Amino acid sequence: MQILEHGQENKRLLLFFPCTAEPVWAFEGAMRLLSQKWRSFQVIYDGHQPENPGDFISVEQTVDEVTAYLKKRGVTRLDAAYGCSLGGACLTRLLALGELPVERAIIDGGITPYRFPYLLRRLVLLRDVLGFKIVAKSRRVLEAAFPPERFTLPGHDAREEYDAIAAYLKTYSAQTIRNVFWSGNNYALPHPPAPIAAEIVYWYGDEEKKDRRGNIRFIKHYFPQARIHGIPKMAHAELVMIYPEEFCRYFDKFMCR
């Protein structure tokens, strides 16, 4: 695992857990804006950068390593934390453990543990792994699932970006793919969570509301203090990557009030 630090001159501390299946540069716009106000710690998961050896193991290991890293750097509390999708799963566990207090947290389309029978969870894993591999191998499927005219980053050439994304997805090992989906959907949480004073909001894009219904129900039950907020006209993880300025307006509205 690697953690990039931005905005070291700032006093307020932000932990940023990205989603999976996206390279570091997909978050450059958001991180550039956030680092103007925040000392930001951006997590890069194992198995997610070709130049870094190793496989992604689990949400649990990631949270333990992030917590240990920050404490070693003298960080004993965070002013803010953000996690998207798999990153939302990591943030949910970090909050639940209560070992690193957080003042305010945004769980953006965060994945929560399934409560299905074991056999059904194994079948879901098979579906997810096969789906990822099909997208990674087929440019046509990739563009059908994520139309370039909608999901190309601002200022980027669509063909060049999708060439880079297609090549990037092929760098994921079979072990990393399996562990991302299994751990992301089945990570352990304490019941009940540790007592925490964090203000929590769960974001979802309006276009992913149906897919997030189970996650929303879980968060409402597990963190009763959490607010639920829909982002108009957005799909999963679209706001943070494609619209960094708008993302930061939503971010500041919650974090800086």
Give the residues covered by each predicted segment.
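Conserved serine/cysteine hydrolase catalytic core
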Residues: Q175-H221, G230, V240
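Flexible "cap/lid" loop of the alpha/beta hydrolase fold
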Residues: A96, V102-I134
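Conserved HGGG/HGGXW glycine-rich cap/lid loop of the alpha/beta-hydrolase fold
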Residues: L4-N52
